[in-house]
């Protein structure tokens, strides 16, 4: 990745694809996260199954143990990183891994999920082609310029207020600086709730557009960043639909990998996987991305 430039007050962020925090010193020296997966199983948009009491969760390993193993792997690769994890089986409602699930982290580009839901919702049952194209590009390529346009058009922080109320989010708060959508705060648990809303509650047209864009996430983002860290690299043999997030501030580095993961064609979005991280100042993008990939790799055997 080329040197990351400081953004203006409207767009001073440097993002990495998909859903932590610490100052980035000498950003120009940072590169994009290493990525090895070249493809993933693709499945068309579809509604995730509702949780049912009759379905048993085939996951004998402790929820905390898996999350702690993930944290250990991430911190071994990037010492000093704070991690929030929430992984849920949407078919049963069972938690697979959870750690610091109620701790707030910056969303970075993960907030584009809320921008997309609000934008499409404002247009009723069917969005116009131009808006649909913009939302798709904003999500699949994590396009910041389009996010800026839709954020302003939607009333900035009013977008967060509306979506918090619509989804019932409990710990997602709008940024203090209304121009900086990436500084929205959320928790791993709230991001899981956002994915649950997309798959079970959002109108069919909205759901299909968003899931299609996430499923077709480009390896190279609009800003030139390699988005295939965390979920895409670690779970390359499974189907996935992801929204990654990355952001460099003077005080922190945020790197998030979030999405829906499937293990069979009939359940392409069975697992909601959310890993948010705050990594130390000066952590390079290759190190930061590889750290999340190392952690998420440990989920491969648990997601059956």
Regions found by a protein language model. Name each.
Residues 23-24, 28-31, 110-119, 271, ...:
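Hydrophobic alpha-helical membrane segments, chiefly transmembrane helices and signal peptide h-regions
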Residues 121-137, 142, 156, 206:
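Short, well-structured active-site flanking segments
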Residues 119, 148, 152:
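Glycine/small-residue-rich loop that forms an oxyanion/phosphate-binding "nest" at active or ligand-binding sites
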Residues 93, 104-127, 138, 273:
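Active-site SXXK
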Residues 43-57, 94-99, 114-119, 140-144:
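Acidic/histidine-rich, surface-exposed loop or edge segments in extracytoplasmic proteins
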Residues 2-26, 131:
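N-terminal export and membrane-targeting signals
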Residues 80-83, 88-104:
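Short, conserved catalytic-motif segment at the N-terminal edge
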Residues 2, 12-15, 33-52, 58-83, ...:
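Penicillin-recognizing serine hydrolase domain
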């Amino acid at each position: 990745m080329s040197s990351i430039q400081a953004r203006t007050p409207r767009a001073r962020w440097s993002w990495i694809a998909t859903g932590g925090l610490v100052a980035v010193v000498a950003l120009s020296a940072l590169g994009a996260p290493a990525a090895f997966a070249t493809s993933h199983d693709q499945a068309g948009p579809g509604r995730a199954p509702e949780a049912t009491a009759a379905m048993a969760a085939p996951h004998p390993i402790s929820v905390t143990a898996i999350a702690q193993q993930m944290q250990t792997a991430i911190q071994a690769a990037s010492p000093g990183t704070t991690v929030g994890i929430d992984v849920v089986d949407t078919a049963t409602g069972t938690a697979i891994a959870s750690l610091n699930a109620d701790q707030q982290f910056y969303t970075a580009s993960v907030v584009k999920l809320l921008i997309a839901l609000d934008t499409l919702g404002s247009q009723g049952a069917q969005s116009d082609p131009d808006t649909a194209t913009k939302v798709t590009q904003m999500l699949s390529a994590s396009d910041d310029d389009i996010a800026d346009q839709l954020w302003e058009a939607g009333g900035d922080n009013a977008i967060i207020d509306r979506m918090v109320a619509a989804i019932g989010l409990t710990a997602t708060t709008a940024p203090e600086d209304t121009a900086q959508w990436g500084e929205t705060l959320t928790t791993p648990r709230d991001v899981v709730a956002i994915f649950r809303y997309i798959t079970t509650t959002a109108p069919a047209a909205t759901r299909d557009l968003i899931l299609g864009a996430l499923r077709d996430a480009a390896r190279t983002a609009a800003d030139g960043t390699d988005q295939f860290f965390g979920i895409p690299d670690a779970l390359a043999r499974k189907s996935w639909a992801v929204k990654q997030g990355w952001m460099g501030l003077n005080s922190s580095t945020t790197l998030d990998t979030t999405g829906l993961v499937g293990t069979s064609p009939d359940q392409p979005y069975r697992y909601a996987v959310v890993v948010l991280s705050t990594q130390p100042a000066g952590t390079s993008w290759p190190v930061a991305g590889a750290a999340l990939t190392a952690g998420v790799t440990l989920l491969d055997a648990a997601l059956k």
